[in-house]
């Protein structure tokens, strides 16, 4: 069956686009290489390491497509303030929701929570055809648009294709789209830590000579001592830090963060 639109990649971007277009009258298919199943969630679940900072604008989009309630019913951590400073102590800047006459600056949300809420909204409406566990192998352009050949041999056709399949996009590669790439020579260490002090519903970021270190507030069952960290360092330093035991890693992290939260 010829579709009007095929979105390749059911991540946060592809799924949000599918929801935004579901009432346009277009025939839409959303395909992904992984399973398209909503995962069970409990408030006591451990935090996933990958999180996103959702701004007020992102919240409005997710509300309009019907996914926001599914996010907050799972787990979303609002932040009211943001504190940014440099490693030498010569500069800092602060932002606050109060100064912006807003309730919050945004929310820190685990990517899997956003993904499951989007998928839940798609399944509840049923107007977008979902095809999971389907990897793209061939892509051909023809007079009517595009034909996609999947790894199971099935062929899908559409007048328009959206490549939402990530940084290493198969669609982009098969379509021959050129890219300009460079290596920042940095690695990011991401994990969740429980701090001595409350995170104060604030996002914190320190800029060091090696790269930025961010502490993003998380809450689990009312416990506001958790933070998701993103620590950008050189490859060699990342390997050294990852080889440390938990106590030594926490000591190094505390020093790098100037013990702002203990």
Residue ranges of model-derived segments:
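N-terminal Rossmann-like FAD-binding beta1-loop-alpha1 element of flavoenzymes
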Residues: 3-30
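N-terminal FAD cofactor-binding segment of flavoenzymes
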Residues: 45-87
């Amino acid at each position: 069956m010829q579709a009007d639109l095929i979105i390749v990649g059911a991540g946060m971007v592809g799924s949000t686009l599918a929801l935004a277009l579901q009432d346009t009258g277009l025939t839409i298919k959303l395909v992904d290489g992984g399973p398209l199943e909503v995962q069970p969630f409990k408030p006591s679940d451990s935090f996933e390491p990958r999180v996103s900072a959702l701004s007020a604008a992102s919240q409005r989009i997710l509300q309009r497509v019907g996914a926001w309630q599914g996010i907050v019913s799972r787990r979303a951590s609002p932040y009211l303030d943001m504190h940014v400073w440099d490693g030498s102590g010569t500069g800092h800047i602060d932002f606050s929701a109060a100064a912006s006459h807003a309730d919050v600056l945004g929310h820190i949300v685990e990517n899997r929570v956003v993904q499951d809420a989007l998928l839940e909204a798609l399944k509840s409406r049923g107007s977008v055809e979902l095809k999971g566990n389907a990897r793209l192998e061939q892509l051909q352009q023809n007079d009517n648009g595009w034909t996609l050949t999947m790894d199971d041999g099935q062929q899908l056709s559409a007048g328009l294709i959206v490549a939402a399949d990530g940084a290493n996009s198969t669609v982009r590669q098969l379509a021959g789209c050129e890219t300009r790439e460079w290596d920042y020579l940095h690695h990011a260490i991401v994990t969740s830590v429980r701090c001595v002090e409350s995170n104060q519903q604030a996002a914190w970021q320190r800029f060091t000579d090696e790269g930025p270190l961010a502490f993003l507030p998380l809450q689990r069952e009312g416990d506001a001592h958790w933070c998701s960290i993103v620590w950008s360092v050189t490859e060699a330093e990342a390997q050294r830090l990852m080889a440390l035991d938990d106590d030594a890693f926490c000591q190094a992290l505390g020093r790098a963060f100037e013990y702002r939260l203990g």
